[in-house]
Amino acid sequence: MKKILTIILCSALVVISGCDNYDFAQEQFRKEVNLLSNSSLVYDRQVAELQQGGDTLFVVASLSGSQATDEPVTVVLQHSDTLLRAYNKSNFDINKARFAKYLPEECYEFPTMEMNISAGSSKAMFPVYLKNLEKISPDSIYFLEYKIDSLRTPDCNPKKRHVLLRIHKENYYASTQTATYYNYTSSTVIIPNPDGYSEVRRPTNSNRVFPISENSVRLMAGDENFTDYTTALDIINKGSIILEMGAQLPENPLAKELTILPYQSIDVVQLTPIGEYDNTYLLNVIRTPDGRSTYYKEFRLHYKYRLKSTDLYREVNAKLRYQFNPRVENL
């Protein structure tokens, strides 16, 4: 009986071993070329750094299958214009003011439309050189659109041969990929009235900050209310200011000079520093007695502004903080 059981077990092991050899030694899936994207054919996982010389994003072509290719596979791309229309219809219907746009030609270079997926590899990365991103609006959505040339790349997946490459941008202070909010702390907005009295508001809300260039951001000048950011573009354009960071302060290496500028038509005047409202950017590290540290990116501002020439100036003393983890940002 023991001999019979031994024979059965040995036979089973031989069969399993044979199956393992078949599973791992042979290709189990058809090899097809795909363009990396989500279920909506959008690829939005990359962010362009606003910096001198621009930055590089990639359109990624991948090869399906359980085994790496043993010979090069040529992938040829083409420009396309079908997905953007569908994207706008699906997301914004007839609200044309919010339609996504193609990135202007002056803002990118696409050096090659043909690459190989090398033998032993599973992907090819088409570089997109981005530049002049400070010229595009932080309030608009921008894409580049490509598709696989199926005549010159015959083994492509027809369901994954198109891609919309979303153009996000960021600098050290803010990003368009995820909304960046700075919180008002110990801030006041002084609103004069024609009768000579002034109303003092103490905002405790947050202010969304947008990257403009490598060293500048945009934000609302005051505490004006608007119900929905996506429908308040005119108010935002008229009521926004630019903060432009400059040289490091010699007396404090964690602080930088800061200049306050108009974004569009707003009348803004940078005022003489008062106490901690000294028109600087500060990397503020607050330490507790037990040794823990909390890190803030902080704008310390003193200015006045008005939206129309007939308005009285509103004076702002603001400290805007954004808490962050430097270890996470440096990953």
Predicted regions and their residues:
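Beta-strand-enriched, solvent-exposed domains that form extended recognition/catalytic surfaces
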Residues: 118-125
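Sec-dependent signal peptide recognition
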Residues: 2-10
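C-terminal motif of bacterial Sec signal peptides marking the signal peptidase cleavage site
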Residues: 15-18
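Intrinsically disordered, low-complexity regulatory regions in eukaryotic proteins
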Residues: 20-112, 125, 129-143, 149-331
